[in-house]
Amino acid sequence: VATLDGKSAYADADFVVIAAPTNYDPVKNYFDTTHVEEVIDLVLAVNPNAVMIIKSTIPVGYTRSLYLRYARQGVKQFNLLFSPEFLRESKALYDNLYPSRIIVGYPKQMNHPDFADEDQAIASIADVDRLRQAAGTFAALLVEGAIGNGEPFTFDGPLPIADGVCPREKTKGIPVLGMGMKEAEAVKLFANTYLAL
């Protein structure tokens, strides 16, 4: 059932895909992530157990900063992934059916002093093993919805993306990669930069 009521839409959801606009603000020299954060706040209020997947274009480091922000706000559980989309202008349907790659970023410990606060926040409010599994499940759903090379695909659980590239014989020939969220954000940035050239 289609609805414009976020509360009813998110109440029983396992996954909430956030594809809100993030317009570039030339004054701030930054993406306006206000709408993404509004969705996150509503999901946390209605269904904090749901896994949220950001598909919007966001700055590098944004998702890890959200873990830090929500940990400081006292949130007990925060389930956030990032899965960039690689859609060309006027080719969105084709690019969804025949994706050049599927990437799902999940929270990983960076184990470096510069990221100690973020690592601690992630450890305190995220079940990293559950989110790694959820990333594999979401990747499998994206493969299931794609045509790829036309090979049959049977959803039988999460794809094994935790250690990098999933074997292509499991993914209709589509490269499927799991990585840290900051890495996934950087891949999206580099792809956008390349397409802008």
Could you tell me what each predicted segment is?
Residues 1-197:
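Structural/interface elements that position substrates and couple domains in central-metabolism enzymes
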